[in-house]
Amino acid sequence: YLMGVGTPNDILGAVKRGVDMFDCVLPTRSGRTGLAFTWQGRVNIKNNKYQNDNTPLDLECENLNLNKYSKNYLNHLFNTNEILGSMILTLNNINFYQELMSEIRSNIEKGTFNDFHDKYINKL
């Protein structure tokens, strides 16, 4: 059990060292402040570079309900202080962490965790 450690990189490193349970507020706290976790890495949705970006937040997200929101729409929600932006990013982050943990379990079962770790340790 590892408490208070919550970045995807920290989780990957801890799993590699044998930790199998985590508890951290990072996914929800980050969502409320405009930071999204995605399979392509972290996205600070408040950044002006997303004002005209009509692509989904995470192209690899399996949850189609979350993937329908564009970066420019989420950027608008955060920059106008709409609570919906925080809610969507919080749900996105929780979903991402569920997908991450599912992929970790699957790769452990298949014996491919080290490859998975190496692919994502510097990306997430």
Show the residue positions of the predicted features:
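C-terminal extensions of enzymes
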Residues: 58-124
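Glycine-rich phosphate/ribose-binding loops and adjacent secondary-structure elements
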Residues: 1-57
